[in-house]
Amino acid sequence: LIRRDFSRCIQCGRCIAACNEVQVASAIPYPYGRREERSNAPTGWYPVPDYDKCVYCGECVQACPTGALQDKKACVIDLDKPLKKVRTTCSYCGVGCQIHLHVQDDRVVKVTGVEDAIPNRGRLCVKGRFGYDFIHSDDRLTVPLIKENGSFREASWDEALDLVGRRFSEIKEQHGGDSMACLTSARVSNEENYLMQKLARGGFGTNNIDHCARL
């Protein structure tokens, strides 16, 4: 995930401070064990992490001012082409971290945290910073699929929704509303979670509702 080019390292210690004081992973040690002595690093010393402690959050990458530490996947950025920055909310959990998507040729090529925004103040976990490959994955579903005779076929949204509604109605009629349950996701908004519980209670007639954040 992280490319290291120590020929660019100026031993400023920002990566060490990010790791020890922001992420509190202590994966990159101070050369003499104390921050105030980091400017006295021995010749040839570079911030090599303890991989057993590293959580690959990328804080060191975002803090590095020279490019000695870089996001490997961001190395595809063409410096001769414009780079658009789009602010959005990370969808991996319910914290709501604010992120910048760096977009080039209609593809996300890098993700950074928004420094002046709560709740994360620019900080991200490994998923939020590096887990964006799914956006352009060839395996990503783009149309509804219906399983027939052991295989899936493409269907229209109207056909798929009609089938789902019909099957839910059949289950409710045969077994009652309490035979069904809803498990909602931290990757959707509060409003969508609210609508899901409303569907469960008002449509299915069940109070069997849970959320992945509790698991």
Which residues does each PLM region occupy?
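N-terminal export/assembly segments and adjacent metallocofactor-ligating motifs
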Residues: 1-215
